[in-house]
């Protein structure tokens, strides 16, 4: 492909200032890092280099290129039909966690292999642990209820020297449990993180994907791409959930996001001293009052809400701790002053 000069960089709205993906994608640089991306890159109707974000193969190859270019992860893949997350948004959560730790550490981000994170629902992609380990040197445990996700994540870790010794994978054997069976009695985590299932049923997940397809079709019409709009419309009748990727555990659970996080809060209260900051993404703003009430009921000492935005999408992190001020000081002196 003939190299095309990128247009002047433009910051993506709302991303964290340390997020390396805050500029427009430099496809020429990405292709140099990952030549396999080449056939997926073409000029769009505005004369910019881009990929077709409705094509799962293109999105997966873009992720592979981003992980190689920015995080020195050369070997990355996921099984067909598994969630292929947008890297910029995933990186944002990591950088906001770093800020959260810094606020508990006199403004200094704790870095290095003595800092331990736990990713609940790591998925086959292993993206949160990859970014956290490469950006800050943190060690991770990633858990999942799906055996193939664990197998895929292990393969990614074992296939990249840059991840050696940085990430462990644990299978959650009971799908009703979150921390139980994953956090052992002697485990110490400086933080946990989670992108919980959003929907309450397969029907709700399917409807959400159909809505996404309709929005893509409407945007394509608006931009004058009738051919692409027709393709989106056709895909709406062909298992839309699969068009965007994601297995059952990644997309939905009984009771949806609220029920999942309520369980997480309850289980975290059984392990108050195993972790400094428990955290989760909360996509639905209307779930916040019930979650705050649950955190009050389990006597969380401190609760923080961190707003995040990427373009039109707005979400937030809710983080909580059970450690007293004295325990927090002791934790900081023993673990973060190294």
From Swiss-Prot:
Protein name (record): Ribosomal RNA large subunit methyltransferase F
Keyword Oxidoreductase included in the entry's annotation: no
Its keywords, alphabetically, are: Cytoplasm, Methyltransferase, rRNA processing, S-adenosyl-L-methionine, Transferase
Q: Which domain of life is it from?
A: Bacteria
Q: Which cysteines are joined by disulfide bonds?
A: none
Q: Which Gene3D superfamilies match?
A: Vaccinia Virus protein VP39 (3.40.50.150)
Reaction(s) catalysed (UniProt annotation): adenosine(1618) in 23S rRNA + S-adenosyl-L-methionine = N(6)-methyladenosine(1618) in 23S rRNA + S-adenosyl-L-homocysteine + H(+)
Protein family membership = Belongs to the methyltransferase superfamily. METTL16/RlmF family.
Q: Which NCBIfam families match?
A: PRK11727.1
Q: Which InterPro entries match?
A: METTL16/RlmF, rRNA_lsu_MeTfrase_F, SAM-dependent_MTases_sf
Segments spanning the bilayer are none
List, alphabetically, the HAMAP family matched: 23SrRNA_methyltr_F (MF_01848)
| PANTHER family, sorted | RNA N6-ADENOSINE-METHYLTRANSFERASE METTL16, SAM-DEPENDENT METHYLTRANSFERASE
A biological-process GO annotation: rRNA base methylation
> Which species is listed as the source?
Photobacterium profundum (strain SS9)
What Pfam families does the database record attribute to this sequence?
Methyltransf_10
GO function terms (MF aspect): 23S rRNA (adenine(1618)-N(6))-methyltransferase activity
């Amino acid at each position: 492909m003939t190299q095309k000069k990128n247009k002047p960089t433009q910051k993506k709205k709302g991303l964290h200032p340390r997020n390396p993906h805050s500029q427009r994608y430099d496809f020429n640089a990405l292709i140099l890092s990952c030549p396999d991306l080449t056939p997926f890159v073409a000029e769009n109707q505005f004369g910019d280099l881009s990929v077709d974000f409705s094509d799962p193969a293109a999105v997966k190859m873009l992720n592979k290129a981003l992980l190689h270019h920015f995080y020195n992860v050369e070997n990355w893949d996921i099984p067909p039909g598994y969630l292929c997350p947008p890297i910029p948004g995933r990186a944002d959560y990591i950088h906001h966690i770093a800020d959260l730790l810094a606020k508990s550490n006199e403004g200094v981000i704790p870095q290095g292999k003595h800092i331990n994170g736990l990713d609940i629902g790591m998925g086959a992609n292993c993206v949160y642990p990859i970014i956290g380990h490469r950006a800050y040197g943190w060690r991770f445990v990633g858990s999942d209820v799906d055996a193939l996700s664990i197998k895929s994540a292990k393969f990614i870790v074992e296939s990249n020297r840059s991840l050696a010794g940085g990430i462990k994978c644990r299978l959650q054997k009971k799908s009703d449990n979150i921390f139980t069976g994953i956090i052992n009695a002697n485990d110490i985590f400086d933080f946990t993180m989670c992108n919980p299932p959003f929907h309450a049923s397969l029907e709700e997940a399917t409807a959400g994907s159909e809505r996404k397809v309709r929005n893509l079709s409407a945007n394509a019409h608006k931009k004058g791409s009738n051919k692409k709009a027709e393709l989106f419309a056709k895909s709406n009748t062909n298992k839309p959930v699969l068009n965007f990727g994601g297995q059952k555990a990644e997309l939905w659970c009984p009771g949806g996001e609220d029920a999942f996080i309520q369980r997480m809060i309850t289980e975290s209260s059984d392990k108050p001293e195993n972790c400094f900051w428990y955290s989760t993404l909360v996509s639905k703003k209307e779930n916040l009052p019930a979650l705050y009430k649950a955190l009050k009921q389990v006597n969380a000492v401190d609760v923080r809400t961190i707003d995040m935005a990427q373009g039109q999408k707005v979400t937030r992190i809710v983080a909580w701790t059970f450690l007293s001020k004295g325990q927090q000081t002791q934790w900081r002196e023993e673990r973060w002053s190294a």
